[in-house]
């Protein structure tokens, strides 16, 4: 099956999700972040408490050094998929695949797959999991 070009709405959804993640995880601007997440936000992650309040509450207790970096963002219809890296919260960063369902221009539902970032010694492929360098 040939790849289909993304629609303008898909590009817009990607930009909304990227702005939302930066606003919440990097800038810690909770008031601004509220406009990106639905009040009826559904959370499927095993690591995050339910709802928008659960997510925001978890981030509030994380260290100020928490950072999110994006490597890949793609969209299909109302779904946005990200491959990113969370660091600054402990000794090992997480490499995460996030799937977000958009509804009426806001993040409505979320799933994720999380792995500890492998060091060079741990990588059987010999390649980094995120970017072009292994963690220091």
Show where each model-derived region lies.
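C-terminal and inter-domain tail/linker signature
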Residues: 1-136
């Amino acid at each position: 099956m040939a790849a289909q070009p993304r629609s303008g709405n898909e590009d817009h959804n990607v930009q909304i999700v990227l702005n939302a993640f930066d606003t919440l995880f990097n800038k810690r601007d909770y008031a601004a972040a509220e406009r990106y997440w639905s009040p009826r936000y559904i959370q499927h992650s095993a690591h995050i408490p339910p709802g928008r309040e659960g997510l925001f509450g978890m981030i509030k207790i994380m260290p100020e050094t928490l950072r999110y970096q994006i490597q890949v963002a793609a969209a299909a219809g109302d779904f946005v998929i990200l491959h990113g890296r969370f660091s600054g919260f402990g000794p090992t960063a997480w490499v995460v695949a996030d799937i977000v369902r958009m509804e009426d221009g806001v993040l409505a539902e979320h799933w994720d797959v999380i792995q500890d970032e492998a060091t060079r010694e741990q990588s059987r492929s010999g390649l980094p999991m995120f970017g072009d360098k292994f963690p220091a």
